[in-house]
Structures are given as structure tokens and as C-alpha cells.
Amino acid sequence: MKKIELLAPAGTMEKMKMTLLYGADAVYLAGKVFGLRAYGGNFTKEEMKEAVRYAHGMGKKVYVTVNIIPRNEDLEGLDDYLRYLEEIHVDAALISDLGVFSLAREVAPTLPIHVSTQASAANWRTVKVWKEMGAERVVLAREVSVKEMADIRKKVDIELEVFGHGAMCISWSGRCLLSNFFTHGKRQSNRGECIQACRFKYSVMEESRPGQYWPIEEDEHGTYIFNSKDLCMIDHIPELIEGGASSLKIEGRMKSVYYVAAVVAAYRKAIDTYYAERGAYRVREEWREELEKVSHRPYTTAFAFQEADHTAQEYVKSQPEQPYDFVGLILPAEEGTTRVQQRNHFRVGETLEYLTPKGDVGLFTVGPLTNGEGEAVDRAPHPLEVLTMQTEMKLPAYTILRRRAKHG
């Protein structure tokens, strides 16, 4: 059995490198154009080329999103862009639009194509057609259940990618017009400019049904009827693998370095444990605990085992919980030296928690600090400042330092 791929988001070069170091098999990213995350940082052409070189050097893959639903004016330069992706040997382009798909086949015939979830592939006949047109993989609509995925895989011999973790959209496969409505067309979600309107605070009243109430009218704080919980499938790795998924996708190109690294580390352990133990596999509580330490809304399995109903929505608040602060990042250093880049204030003598690229977690005490001028300091208040730290514990490069948030 071919091992399921762990696919992670890469909004920036730093995030890409961290997700690969923390165990992702592949990353998906976007260029400055033609993607659905216009505000996710994204990559210049040269950065994409470097990303491919870096990932391939680790034996890993890079997929580039070309998944906008384009208008006529969006097509300008698309042919050259697709040729460039082919030229730098990206491992696949993620495409949702039929016209873009056709153009890619025409101008970049050796460029592998994965059909984006925005294409809303929800049945085996649709998947079969995409395969016949030349797609190597289909990212199933998020609304497809595990059972439906298994049925599709039995009928069509093609790679299937499924979302396993991250924020969910209230719209069918992300096809939403709320951003267009609230900005009078100035921000268009299907062209990469989503304003997260589904997370706004709303109050809803239906005047023609007196005496009939919905949970959205529970209290004076309004409602978040559009505000989905976050997807979490950490408890269901066997079902995804045995159901025929080729790739498990983590959402979050606009999330922090800490978020993507920690989530990848948890799913890396779960996937590897499944293949090592098979019939004896069991979910570890520490995996769940790790996912509780990143910014998240309450978790749900959404459509995986039933049609999503009111329980898949979060009615209390729109902002995710942020239980831990990302405090610092251990940088490469000479033997016997520990260098740390500040990401949040910390001080000498403080107890912090660490998360290594292998997913190991533990506590340590911050030792004496020296700043870039060689001066001893008792705290690290400056953003991104690099300090030398004395510590008896040897922490590997790119270890994350964190602490429980005071509000968490």
C-alpha cells in the first residue's frame, strides 16, 4: 500500500521550509497571481523556483495553485505563467476552471494537473471525466463523505485528495459571494480576495414565523450562523487511508509558522503510527493535545460521516481560540551555542515549552541571554531579535518555543 501523502500549506518561503522540516511530504503554494489567497504572502517567480529546488532536494513536492475562477481580463498572461510552472518542474498545478485546465494541457503538456476543490467534484462520474481529460489527481469537494470517497475510489483509478484539518467555509466548496456583496464588488472571494465575511457578527430575524426560534437567537451577542467550526480528522486517519485517500491536506496558507508546523507534526505522527501499527493502531491523546495548542475554533468532522448540520457551526464567537503564544524559534548555530529568534517577549528564568521538528515536546528554563552586541540581557522584548542563550539542553535547529497564553 502506497503511503498517504501529508500535504501542507506554504504561504511564504519560511512557512514552506518549516512545514517540510516538520514532516510534510508536499506543500501547496501560490504565485502572486491566479491563486485564491491574494493576501497570503505568496511567492514571486524566483521564489517558486527556489521553493521547488529546496523541496526536491529533500525528496518532497511542490504544488502551485492556479485555482481562481477567472474573468476575461484574468486570462492575460496565464499561458506564459503555466509555461513557467512547467519549466521550473513544479509537481502539479491545482486548477478549478475548465478553460484554465484546457489551456494548461495546450501550452504546458507535461505539467501535471490536480483538480482543485473549487471544481466541486462530488461524484465518481465527475472524477472520471476529469481523469479522462488528463488530471492526475482530484481534490474532492469538502462536502464528500468518507463513504462517498471510498465509492469514488472503487470506480475510478485516480489519486484523491481530501481536506483533513483546518478552517472550513460555509459556502459549497468555497464558492462564495459574501465578500463581493459587502465590498460592493471591490473584493471578490473567487478571485483570491476573501474578506472572511462569514466570521462577522450577525443577528438574524425571520418575521413571518412568530414563536419559531433557532439557536442563532439564543442571546444578545448575536449569531455566527455562517461561522463554521474547524475541521479535524486526527481521530480518523484509518478511515481516510482505508477509504482510498492518496493525500491528506491541511488548510492554512494564511496561518502562522507555528500553526502549520505544529499541525503537521501531529498528523505526521498519526500517519506514521498507523503504518507502523496497522491493526493495533490507536489514537494518542498527545496528538489531540497538540492540536488544542494552536489557534483554532471548536473542532468538527463536518461532512466526513454525515451531512453537516447546525452542530458544525460555532455560535459563541468568531475569533479562534489562541491558547499558546509562539515565543521563539531556535536557529542553526555552531556546536555548543544556542541561537534563538524572538517571536514574542520572554525573559531569563522563564519556563517555556518546546516543540522539535520531530514532534518531541517538553519544558525547559530560559538561560542567560546575550544580544547581538554581546551584552548580557535579562529579557527579549524586541521583535525578531536574534539572541544567544546559555542552556544545558541541546535544542535542534528550528525548534519552536511557546508558552500558554495568559488569556488561553
Kindly give the residue locations of the regions a language model identified.
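Gly/Gly-Pro- and Ser/Thr-rich, intrinsically disordered tail segments characteristic of DNA damage-repair
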Residues: E76, V115-W124
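Surface-exposed amphipathic alpha-helical tracts and adjacent flexible/coil segments at the periphery
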Residues: M1-L21, A26-V33, V52, M58-I68, ...
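Conserved phosphotransfer cores of two-component systems
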Residues: A108
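Glycine-rich, positively charged N-terminal anion/phosphate-binding segment
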Residues: R37-Y54
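Alpha-helix capping/helix-boundary segments
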Residues: G99-V100, M168
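Short beta->alpha linker loops
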Residues: G11, S96-G99, A122, V144
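Short active-site loop/helix that positions an aromatic residue
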Residues: S102-R105
